Every structure is written in C-alpha cells, then in structure tokens.
C-alpha cells in the first residue's frame, strides 16, 4: 500500500483542549471537522494514550483553537510533543475559559469553538468525539495553518500518536 496517498488528504491543524479534575489539557490535532449545521456538531479524533483524550472523556467537553498560518513551531511543539501530565502547557499562553469550563487557546488562533460531547465512537487506537457546539468565535482575519503547511513550510514531524502516523519501513 502506498501510504503517501494518505498524505494527500487535506487537514487543518488545531489545538484541542479540555479540563478535568482541575487540570488543563491540550494537544495538537489534525482531525477536526464539522458534521452538521442543525444542531452544529463537530468531531475530534484523539489518541487514547493522550491526556487530552482522557480529559474529554471525563469532562464531556472540549475546545478547538483553529491555528493561524504564522504559528511558530515552538508553539506547536508545546502542545504537540509533550504530555499535559508532565508539562504545564498553558503557562505563559494566552487562553480564556469557555462556557463549559474548558480552556480555549487564543494565542495564534484564528477562531475558537467549544462543544459538549454527545457521542463517542471507538475507532481502535483513537476515539472520535462528536460534540454539539455551545459557542464559537472568530478572533482574527488570518490564513489558517494546514497540515500540509506544517510539513512543507515548517518541516514538522508526525508524532506516533497522530491519526496520520505510519511507521517507517
């Protein structure tokens, strides 16, 4: 199978957040999409090994920050290559608390969306969380960061827990 074909699928790059038991969690994700408009539902797909996955499962809510094209790699790395349980990802980061209590990262974000989980779907290594939007806000008029930009312009790597990770042969 030519795994390069999967790299041709277009994705955005987002920070998915949640809070459980007083601990804020956040991670980079590329699998975020709108499902319906009435009611407005979005889905996020998170690896079961990630702290953010567990926080969403426990709290029943999540936030999504749509990243701008100019997001620095250091900022992406802060949320993409460290566990929330081992590093305070939100120290020094601009964010606000949403209606459900989840942190919404506003720094380098074009928009933020907040949702309450209405359904979960186990897809093996990951869980697809379907959420009904409770709030959304456009923060600035800027180009959004895509997964292709992350790889081509920023020379970003794919973590082992990503939905699009394939082991090298």
Curated annotation (Swiss-Prot):
Molecular functions (GO terms): ferric-chelate reductase (NADH) activity; ferric-chelate reductase (NADPH) activity; FMN binding; oxidoreductase activity, acting on metal ions, NAD or NADP as acceptor; protein homodimerization activity; riboflavin reductase (NADPH) activity
Highest taxon above the source species: Archaea
Temperature dependence per UniProt: Optimum temperature is 88 degrees Celsius.
Cofactor(s) essential for the protein: FMN; FAD
Binding of FMN, residues: 27-31, 45-52, 82-84, 89
Reaction(s) catalysed (UniProt annotation): 2 a Fe(II)-siderophore + NAD(+) + H(+) = 2 a Fe(III)-siderophore + NADH; 2 a Fe(II)-siderophore + NADP(+) + H(+) = 2 a Fe(III)-siderophore + NADPH
EC identifiers of the protein: 1.16.1.10
Binding residues annotated for NADP(+), in chain numbering: 7, 126, 147-154
EC class: oxidoreductase
Pfam families: Flavin_Reduct
UniProt entry keywords in alphabetical sequence: Flavoprotein, FMN, NADP, Nucleotide-binding, Oxidoreductase
Annotated Gene3D superfamilies: Electron Transport, Fmn-binding Protein, Chain A
Main function: Catalyzes the reduction of bound ferric iron (Fe(3+)) in a variety of iron chelators (siderophores) using NAD(P)H as the electron donor, resulting in the release of Fe(2+). Not active with uncomplexed Fe(3+). Also reduces FMN and FAD, but not riboflavin.
Family listed: Belongs to the non-flavoprotein flavin reductase family.
Subunit structure: Homodimer.
Name of the molecule in the record: Ferric-chelate reductase (NAD(P)H)
